[in-house]
Amino acid sequence: VLPSVQAAVAAGVEEIVVAQEAAAEAELVPGARVTAVRHVGQLVERYGGRLSAAVAAALEQVTEAATDDAPTTPPRDAEQPDLADVVGQSEARQALEVAAAGGHHLIMVGPPGTGKTMLAERLPSILPPLEQADAVTVTSLHSVAGIFDPARGLITRPPLRAPHHTATRAAVVGGGSGLPRPGDVSLAHRGVLFLDEAPEFSAGVLDCLRQPLESGVVTIDRVGGRASYPAAFQLVLAANPCPCGKAGGRGLECTCTSLQRRRYFSRLSGPLLD
């Protein structure tokens, strides 16, 4: 709903009619004059039409049944992780602060349990709130993906997306049947895309990050058509120092050969690291 209303306002449409359930989402677009109707009968009557008593009664009955099934408890916002929660880790905290201030990408390498994931999840907490235009764009992307809850209002904080290392290219970049839907790179627009265990991702997924990193846009071609979505994000990679994860750890003996270590990090291509 949100992207459609945004496009209508940009095209100069003066009044936008939506279902009552979609009114909260439609009204998030600045400049939108939204009219909400419970059923099509109200729309007919608004513009001078008349319905027979039987049709009007049937519409009211169907609408009341649908309203009774709708949830009435508003969702609760999840508390966002905060960098202030981190104790110690002064060098890592400073690296995050520099990355946040300059919009730099970041890679963290260390043994398991050293706090890489905890730190990455808290990077959005030190980024500035989204500008109004960016907030509408980010919210629109989540709406197109079908994961936006209008009851929470506009997304005003930089989003964080952290796909699993088994995620497919379609999940990370976007895709699906019919019109392609945005993937994690677009859902992280103006926020953070965090790839934990980065060398474990498939080479195809890692290589497909190069286009959005260079242009801030991702283009998806499917049989159902072509779609371009914004994808300007900060990339944070986390990796173990070797396949077994023990290299560099205190009191731990690495069992990997030098060849295994080279192969492990060779999955992160030079262009991606650049």
Task: Label the model's feature ranges.
Residues 160-161, 180-190, 220-241, 252, ...:
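AAA+/SF3 P-loop NTPase mechanochemical coupling elements
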Residues 1-107, 111-117, 221:
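Peripheral, non-AAA+ core regions of ATP-driven protein-machinery
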Residues 8, 39, 96, 117, ...:
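Conserved RecA-like P-loop NTPase ATPase core
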Residues 97, 153-159, 170-193, 226:
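Conserved alpha-helical scaffold flanking the Walker A/P-loop in AAA+ ATPase domains
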Residues 164, 180-214, 246-249, 269-273:
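Conserved AAA+/SF3 P-loop NTPase catalytic/coupling segment centered on the Walker-B
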Residues 196-198, 223-224, 237-242, 257-260:
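A short beta-strand-to-loop transition that corresponds to the Sensor-1 phosphate-sensing loop
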Residues 107-152, 215:
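Walker A/P-loop
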Residues 178-180, 207-229, 248-268:
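Substrate-gripping "pore-loop 1 plus following alpha2 helix"
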